[in-house]
């Protein structure tokens, strides 16, 4: 969740970083199809500390009605373009300090719209270790390169033999290193080769010898070959996981023979055959430039691009799955018995009342020869507390425990409780968390999971916000994707979900309040502490009495906080 304080920003007004006309606001406006003044006004709101949920709901007149999705896209692009602008500034300063910044290069850098292209332009000016090419240049071999490329004889190398270059062969190797470095730092050439590689290349994989048995889940990839453009994100992640587990040998191949790419290099650098003595040298430079530099860097780039694209697609799917879980219809304020299934360690059980308060806990062992005893104990609890819902976790022993729950329901006096099997993903993580320890300091860790299972049936959103979104189990490859990207994406979903339905300020836990627009973790704790000391809030204005909850935070949060029974609920 973004802190309620103002953002750190690089100016988004037209500046020398963006050339004469294009501001960050105008770039985003063009991409989103929104008027520039509306984008700029929205950026100003974000910089002032306003959150996306607040802007989406209460500043429609400023944004022109942009929804949560558009505002999130604007926010992401704003961060990217500001990072790009800052990087441009750094690179321009570096090249200027080297005395190599021309007006043409400055304009090229200012016009760049991607980080990859920017780094391509910076390649020739990067300060790096002394390369073979640098050593060769210091030895004066740059002059030899000029003579050779002008059609000079290879015998000229004899005249450059010196310390460090003991014979003609080592001199020619030094000359070649100079040309190869020039090839590998030509921004336009690097970009063209990279795009051709991505357009024409193929992902290939094969099983590593001896891994056939243990790698059966990857059998679809034992003899695999598919164009990059046809690879769905889940297949990319499967290939990379198989490679990481030592089952698959994965290769991101160029898709064309070497001659195709070498032809592009020769054409773009003027290293085609000229029918003179230096043709062999030219061909050798092109071949080395491709095989040792551009083929390697292009394969690395493809791997990164495919992974990034797969990560983004996967996070999008995971986010939708999480949203569905969070916004699942709550069962409501009904007494619930939560059952956390298990074999040897028993079934952990907890009864909570309609507000989620824990009334009773017990561990029974129906799957260890004590079925009848377990049924009797739980039937007694159901009747004692008027339980209306039986929430069964879907983990180990779930099916057998569900059968037990249905028998218990059949024995209930009066209205028969309803049995529901729900996801228990993250319950064990919650059980051992600091939040759970604060909530139930005297309760055994194993029983906390049963409480969580019962409560998440009553109100999924209120309970699931206590758990790290990554622990809820939202997708098959969630541990393979970029974890920072995943955390940010899922965090956004939780924030939007909480603010879309609002929060009862007199019932909400600190973790739930923390997800409300403008409410920081400290502020959430202060709200709960004030409520515990002074009783339920009577009105929204009373929130201003909470320590550190000032007018700015109140403006952001008030619209998302409900006070049932108040004059302004």
Q: Residue locations for each model-derived region?
A:
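N-terminal cofactor/phosphate-binding cores enriched in small/glycine residues
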Residues: 34-69
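Generic start-of-chain signal for non-secretory N-termini
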Residues: 13-40, 47
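Phosphate-backbone recognition surface of nucleic-acid-processing proteins
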Residues: 367-379, 398, 548-568
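Long, highly charged, low-complexity intrinsically disordered interaction regions
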Residues: 21-24, 76, 82-101, 110, ...
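Active-site proximal loops enriched in glycine and acidic residues that flank catalytic Cys/His/Asp
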Residues: 341, 353, 394-396, 423, ...
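Duplex nucleic acid-engaging cores and interfaces of nucleic-acid transaction enzymes
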Residues: 54, 67-73, 80-338, 342-442, ...
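Extended, hydrophobic alpha-helical segments in both membrane/secreted and soluble proteins
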Residues: 335-352, 358, 374, 378, ...
């Amino acid at each position: 969740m973004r802190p309620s304080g103002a953002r750190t920003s690089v100016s988004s007004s037209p500046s020398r970083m963006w050339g004469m006309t294009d501001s960050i606001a105008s770039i985003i406006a063009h991409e989103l199809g929104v008027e520039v003044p509306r984008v700029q006004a929205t950026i100003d709101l974000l910089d002032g500390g306003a959150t996306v949920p607040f802007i989406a709901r209460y500043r429609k007149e400023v944004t022109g009605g942009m929804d949560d999705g558009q505002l999130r896209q604007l926010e992401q692009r704003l961060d990217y373009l500001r990072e790009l602008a800052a990087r441009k500034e750094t690179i321009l300063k570096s090249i200027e300090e080297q005395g190599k910044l021309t007006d043409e290069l400055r304009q090229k850098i200012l016009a760049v719209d991607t980080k990859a292209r920017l780094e391509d332009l910076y390649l020739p000016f990067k300060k790096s270790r002394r390369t073979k090419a640098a050593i060769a240049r210091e030895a004066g071999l740059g002059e030899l390169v000029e003579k050779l490329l002008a059609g000079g004889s290879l015998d000229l190398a004899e005249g450059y033999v010196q310390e460090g270059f003991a014979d003609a062969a080592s001199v020619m190797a030094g000359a070649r290193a100079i040309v190869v470095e020039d090839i590998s730092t030509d921004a336009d050439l690097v970009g063209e080769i990279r795009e051709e590689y991505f357009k024409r290349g193929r992902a290939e994989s094969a099983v590593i010898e001896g891994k056939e048995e243990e790698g059966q889940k990857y059998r679809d990839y034992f003899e695999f070959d598919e164009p990059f453009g046809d690879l769905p994100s889940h297949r990319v992640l499967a290939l990379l996981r198989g490679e990481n587990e030592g089952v698959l040998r994965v290769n991101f191949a160029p898709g064309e023979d070497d001659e195709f790419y070498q032809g592009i290099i020769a054409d773009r650098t003027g290293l085609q055959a000229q029918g003179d003595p230096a043709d062999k040298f030219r061909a050798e430079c092109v071949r080395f430039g491709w095989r040792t530099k551009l083929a390697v860097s292009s394969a690395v780039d493809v791997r990164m691009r495919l992974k990034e694209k797969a990560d983004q697609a996967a996070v999008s799917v995971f986010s939708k799955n999480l949203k569905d879980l969070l916004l699942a219809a709550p069962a409501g304020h009904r007494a619930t018995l939560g059952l956390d299934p298990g074999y040897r360690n028993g079934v952990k059980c907890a009864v909570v009342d309609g507000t989620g308060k824990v009334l009773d806990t017990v561990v029974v062992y129906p799957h260890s020869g004590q079925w009848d005893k377990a049924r009797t104990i739980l039937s007694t609890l159901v009747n004692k507390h008027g339980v209306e819902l039986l929430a069964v976790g879907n983990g180990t022993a779930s099916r057998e425990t569900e059968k037990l729950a249905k028998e218990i329901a059949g024995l209930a006096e009066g209205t028969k409780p309803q049995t529901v099997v729900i996801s228990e993903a993250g319950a064990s993580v919650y059980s051992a968390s600091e939040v759970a320890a604060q909530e139930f300091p005297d309760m055994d860790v194993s029983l906390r999971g049963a409480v969580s299972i019962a409560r998440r049936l009553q109100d999924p959103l209120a309970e699931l916000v206590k758990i790290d979104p990554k622990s809820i189990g939202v997708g098959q490859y969630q541990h393979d994707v970029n974890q920072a990207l995943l955390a940010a994406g899922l965090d956004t979903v939780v924030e939007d979900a909480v603010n879309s339905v609002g929060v009862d300020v007199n019932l909400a836990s600190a973790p739930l309040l923390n997800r409300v627009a403008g409410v920081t973790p400290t502020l959430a704790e202060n709200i709960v502490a004030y409520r515990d000391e002074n009783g339920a809030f009577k009105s929204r204005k009373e929130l201003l009495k909470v320590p550190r909850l000032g007018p700015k935070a109140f403006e952001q949060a008030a619209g998302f906080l409900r006070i049932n029974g108040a004059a302004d609920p």
